Structure formats: C-alpha cells, structure tokens
C-alpha cells in the first residue's frame, strides 16, 4: 500500500511494507522484538489502527489500557471492548476522574488536553512498570506535537533526523531517568499523514463508531472528549465539566441522528458544526433551548 506524497516527501516513507520493515529493525536494534507491549487505547481510529498494525507485525501486545473519567463518551469504552475481543487482548480500564479534578484546579481551558494526556502517560508508565513491561504504544500520528520532540531527540543522538528511527524512542525521556532500562514509546503511525491512517484503517477493516463531536483537528474528525470544548480562558472546575458533558451529549446525539458533527464551547455557548450549515446550527439551538429553560 502506497502512502501519500506528504508522507513520502516529508517523512521519507513510501509504503506500508517499508514501514513494517523499519519498525522490525528498530525493535531488533533495541533487543525488544519479543518484549511485551502495553497500549494506550482510546477507542478512536488512531490507536485502533496502531493495534492492528502491531498485531500484523506479530508484536507482543500484552494489555490495552483505556483511561476514562466521569465525562468520557460511552462509545469510547465500547470500541475498546470490541478491540479487546477482536484481537484477544486483555483490557485494563482506569478511572482518572479524581486525578483530573486535582490537576486541573486553577488551570485554564486551554490546558485541559495537555493535563489529561500527562495524567494518562504517567499512569501508563506506572501500570507498565507493575506488569514488568517497558514498551508503551500510542496512536500518535504526524499531526501530534510529540513529532517535534521525537525529531529533536533523533537530532541529539544522530546529528540529524533519521526518519526510519522515529517509531520506537524513549521520548519523553523523563520516564527513563535513573532507570536500568529505558522506557520506550512505540508510535507506529508517527510518520503518517491523516489520509494514510485512514487508508490503513480501511486496509485492516477497522470500524469505528463516532460520538459525532467536532474534534480537536478540524478537517480530520479526530474525537476525544467533551472537556476539550472549555473556552480557552475559562477556569476549569467540576461544575464546568458537568455542563460541558450535558450540553455536548445533547448536541452530539442530534448531530448523529442527522448525519453531521456538533460541539458546544462553554461557558460562551458557541455552537460549532461540521459541515457548517445554518440548518444544523438551528437544530442544535432548538435542542439546547429546553436545557437552557430548565
């Protein structure tokens, strides 16, 4: 399967066979080919596709970890349960609600996803350590900011970005400090453009049920959870989280029924729809009117 021109030119990766070969070589170099892997599984297209690719390579995935909180979409858990059954991998469900409330105290809306990701990464490292596993797999693709950190690490080690070593690195390095063996993060999709991830998803017959939110990457329909729709300068707290869930649950249910995507920013109550059509905004406004009046 050939990859997009962007992936070929910007990440020096031509096709799936090349990616598979590069990944196996990286595992061999780290003497990790037979080691166990723990996967941070969100239930979305990226982590699901990454799991399918890793299984295709014959890598040893021992556990899926699904992090959730009180305001998570039910559909995410459902998708992870399906993946667990499809690939016969046990899943650990881990509730981060209390930790999220603690770490977001006094923080602004713009930092919610960063805080949540850090909590999940910290806990994934802890769980992996308990299981005697040092490789953590994520569904990070070329869209992610961590791509830059991985490239910087490769520059430090090799003097340049060696693209065919991007998938298996000890980035972030803070988790390996003082350890006998470095903690490795395996990102099989880290060089792929979104369109290539979608191609791979089709190739592996991965079907994802959507919540029908707008998502954090306009144009790519990548979903997460309703808390990302807190206004940038809003003070994060439990009351706001409850409101975000209530409003966005209604909005996504309407959007799913009518075949579009919708999300509500709070406390501004800004309505976002994809595609942008007045009729869709009207549908959401009408659905939310009862909430505002109750």
Curated annotation (Swiss-Prot):
Q: Where are the transmembrane segments?
A: none
Q: Which InterPro entries match?
A: ATPase_PP-loop_MJ1016 (IPR012122), Ni-pincer_cofactor_biosynth (IPR052188), QueC (IPR018317), Rossmann-like_a/b/a_fold (IPR014729)
Q: Which domain of life is it from?
A: Archaea
For this protein, the record's Pfam families field holds: QueC
Cited Gene3D superfamilies = HUPs
What protein am I looking at?
A: Uncharacterized protein MJ1016
Q: Which organism is it from?
A: Methanocaldococcus jannaschii (strain ATCC 43067 / DSM 2661 / JAL-1 / JCM 10045 / NBRC 100440)
């Amino acid at each position: 399967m050939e990859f997009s021109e962007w992936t070929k030119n910007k990440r020096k990766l031509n096709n799936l066979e090349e990616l598979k070969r590069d990944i196996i070589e990286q595992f061999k170099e780290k003497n990790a080919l037979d080691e166990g892997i723990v996967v941070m599984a969100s239930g979305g297209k990226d982590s699901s596709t990454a799991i399918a690719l890793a299984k295709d390579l014959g890598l040893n995935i021992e556990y899926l970890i699904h992090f959730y909180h009180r305001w998570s979409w039910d559909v995410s858990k459902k998708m992870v349960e399906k993946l667990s059954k499809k690939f016969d991998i046990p899943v650990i469900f881990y509730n981060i609600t209390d930790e999220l409330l603690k770490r977001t105290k006094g923080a602004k809306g713009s930092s919610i996803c960063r805080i949540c990701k850090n909590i999940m990464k910290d806990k994934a490292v802890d769980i992996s350590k308990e299981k005697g596993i040092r490789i953590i797999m994520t569904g990070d693709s070329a869209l992610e900011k961590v791509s830059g950190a991985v490239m910087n690490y490769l520059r430090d080690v090799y003097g340049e970005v060696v693209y065919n070593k991007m998938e298996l690195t000890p980035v972030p390095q803070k988790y390996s400090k003082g350890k006998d063996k470095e903690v490795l993060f395996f990102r099989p999709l880290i060089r792929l453009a979104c369109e290539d991830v979608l191609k791979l998803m089709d190739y592996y017959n991965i079907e994802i049920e959507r919540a029908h939110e707008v998502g954090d990457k306009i144009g790519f329909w990548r979903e997460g959870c309703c808390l990302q729709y807190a206004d940038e300068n809003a003070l994060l707290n439990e009351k706001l989280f409850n409101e975000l869930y209530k409003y966005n649950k209604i909005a996504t249910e309407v959007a799913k029924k009518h075949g579009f995507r919708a999300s509500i920013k709070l406390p501004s109550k800004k309505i976002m729809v994809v595609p942008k059509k007045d009729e869709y905004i009207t549908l959401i406004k009408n659905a939310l009117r009862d909430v505002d009046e109750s």
